[in-house]
Regions:
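Helix-to-loop junction immediately C-terminal to a conserved catalytic motif
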Residues: 22
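Conserved ABC transporter NBD signature motif
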Residues: 30-38
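Conserved ABC ATPase "signature" region
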Residues: 38, 88-106
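ABC ATPase NBD coupling module
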Residues: 39-55, 81, 87
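Conserved ABC ATPase signature
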Residues: 111-115, 119
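Hydrophobic anchor residue at the start of the ABC signature
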Residues: 125, 153
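A short, proline-enriched helix->beta-strand linker immediately N-terminal to the Walker B motif
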Residues: 130-134
Length: 180
């Protein structure tokens, strides 16, 4: 698990780069290599398999979460889309993911508007981890958080990287976050 930092001014294309790598936006030229394979122009089936290995943590935890879904529903959604697990298995995995990112079990039926920014970002992190990815684009994951919460979330991300051997593309405009 390594981290590559992408630092630049607002509007310079950092987030666009992350989205192109994940195929959330189409590339216009060049190649994107993932695990030694060109994934620039893959069919839908291959793209679906890639998405399990490549995830994103968005900058704004509030706008990236569906306000009509509970915490457990948000975290469980990728598992439902993938299929192959019973509801009980998905629920168990969701509870484990909540524990992994430091979300109390009592929050499973809470909605995003009921939580602070740090907890919302932990939901986004748990959702990104649900399919056991190898690579995560971290698109300014702490820029919308209070400074005290930023350190907690960054420490969590470092711990997860070590435990799960994750590779991060860490996008930020703040050099102190990259140094952290």
């Amino acid at each position: 698990g390594k981290t590559l930092g992408v630092v630049g001014e607002s509007g310079c294309g950092k987030s666009t780069l992350g989205r192109v790598i994940l195929h959330l936006l189409d590339s216009t030229d060049g190649q994107i290599l993932f695990e030694g394979e060109d994934v620039t122009h893959v069919d839908k089936a291959k793209l679906r398999a890639l998405r399990e290995k490549m995830q994103i943590i968005f900058q704004d935890p509030y706008s990236s979460l569906n306000p009509r879904m509970s915490v457990s529903e948000i975290i469980m959604e990728p598992l439902q889309l993938k299929g192959g697990m019973s509801h009980a298995e998905m629920y168990e995995k969701t509870k484990k993911l909540m524990d992994t990112v430091g979300l109390a079990a009592r929050l499973e039926n809470a909605y995003p508007h009921e939580l602070d920014g740090g907890r919302r970002q932990r939901i986004g992190i748990a959702r990104a981890l649900a399919l056991n990815p190898r690579f995560i684009v971290c698109d300014e994951p702490v820029s919308a958080l209070d400074v005290s919460i930023q350190a907690q979330v960054l420490n969590l991300m470092l711990d997860l990287q070590e435990e799960r051997n994750l590779t991060y593309l860490f996008i930020t405009h703040d050099l102190s976050v990259v140094k952290y």
